[in-house]
Design a protein with these regions (language model features):
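Short helix-loop-beta-strand segments that form the rim/entrance of peptidase-like active sites
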Residues: 49-74
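Soluble non-cytosolic domains of exported or imported proteins
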Residues: 33-41, 55, 70-74, 112-116, ...
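Extracytoplasmic/secreted envelope proteins and their assembly/folding machinery
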Residues: 40, 44-47, 58, 73-80, ...
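Loop/turn elements at helix/coil->beta-strand transitions in domains of secreted/extracellular proteins
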Residues: 14-18, 57-62, 87-92, 126-130, ...
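A glycine-rich helix N-cap at a beta->alpha junction
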Residues: 81-104
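Acidic, glycine-rich active-site loops and adjacent beta-strand->loop/helix elements
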Residues: 24-26, 64-72, 97-100, 122, ...
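Soluble metallo-hydrolase cores and metallopeptidase-like ectodomains found primarily
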Residues: 1-33, 45-55
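Active-site-adjacent substrate-binding region
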Residues: 101-167
Length: 167
């Protein structure tokens, strides 16, 4: 399989890239609704919403549906490999790979200075039930990006997972 990529080109800093994504595959015979259908839908919905309101980002935002996360990270590895070959400037990557329930927290892997800036977003997000901002976060698909570009900040969404494995 291949990664599926959509992009909104930045108006002021088009060479600075923010990646948002989830992965297309799941474990057979599971249907993959939470791992990671929800992350794919969330990624597509962010792009759809931005397009619907005519949002023009300052930086380029890439919306990536990664291939083959469950069996070798081929999509994430290829994305990072191609980005490095093109000498792209990836400043932030956010992955949703933990289901589609109510958001409760975000985890971030970034410098102390970046984390202090991100903490300023907390009051904007807390009314939606997402009240925790923690150190350490990211995702399997965006991990290769951090290895290719050590200064790339990573984020991961942590939804309420108490019913993740309910039958």
């Amino acid at each position: 399989g291949h990664n599926v990529i959509g992009e909104l080109v930045g108006s002021e800093f088009p060479d600075e890239i923010i990646t948002i994504g989830g992965h297309l595959d799941s474990w057979d015979p599971a249907e993959g609704a939470h791992d990671d259908g929800a992350g794919c839908v969330q990624t597509i919905e962010i792009l759809r919403a931005f397009k619907a309101i005519g949002y023009k980002p300052k930086r380029t935002i890439r919306f990536v549906l990664f291939a083959n996360e469950e069996n070798g990270l081929r999509g994430g590895n290829k994305y990072a490999e191609e980005a490095k070959a093109k000498n792209e400037k990836h400043i932030f990557a956010l992955e949703s790979d933990a289901g589609g329930f109510t958001p409760r927290a975000f985890g971030f892997t970034m410098s102390d200075e970046q984390f202090q800036k991100v903490l300023q977003w907390k009051p904007l997000i807390a009314p939606y039930g997402c009240s925790e901002f923690n150190r350490g976060g990211g995702g399997a698909d965006i991990g290769p990006l951090r290895r290719a570009f050590p200064t790339t900040a990573l984020g991961g969404l942590s939804p309420d997972s108490q019913r993740y494995f309910d039958i």
